[in-house]
Amino acid sequence: ANPVKQMLERLQEGLSDRFKIEIRSSSDEGDYFELYGGGRKVTVHANNYVSAAFGINWYLKYYCHAHVSFCGDQLPQLPVDLPQVKERHATKLSDNFYMNYCTFSYTTAFWNWKRWEREIDLMALSGINMPMAMVGVEAVWRNTLLKFGYTLPEVKEFLCGPAYFGWLLMGNLENIGGPLPDEWFKEQIVLQKKILARMREYGMKPVFQGFFGMVPSSLKEKYPEARLVEQVPLYNVFTRSNPDSLYQK
């Protein structure tokens, strides 16, 4: 199924019938979209689904005076005869990044699938192809720490609540705003799988969290032989030494 067609139907019933979408590779290896025609239907040529969605949003904005945005939509019924168009836009910039760690505290902490579906559609319409995908990282922490000898209550004591996930992701906070209920982990795993599936349908490249060395302060009780470095209260100073062998595990 064409995710752009499905997205257009979510915006407005029948909107997908007004666009013919053809995905074609680009000879110059850049992202591009081309708009042709008018009347009953506009033809969109693009190198991928995100470029096609961005091109359609361009047409809606500059030819139909419609507005689809993160702040709301003004999308009237399109005229029977669509305005004529012949345009091509291209870029050599291949990675369009979106979101930051704090987004997952301030904004998305309690989003459900319906809200995420809307956000991913808006990403595509905005030409975004490299969004952060941090939903459910706390479940990864849970599973990892359980493998390293933690009990579930101990894991929950380390993790923070949803409103503080940004700081957990950045590695400068633990044990604030929790504990998380058991159902939370299950729900977030299901939600993240839906998010990733939709992003990949569009051809997006989701960005995941890597391990950068932060561990619970209680890890020294589990692994007393490991060389752990406490976070000192200094600003903008690098204090870390070479990591212990436990880091590799």
Describe the function of each predicted region.
Residues 1-93:
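Contiguous, structured surface segment used for ligand recognition
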Residues 24-26, 38-45, 49, 74-75, ...:
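Aromatic-lined carbohydrate-binding surfaces of glycoside hydrolases
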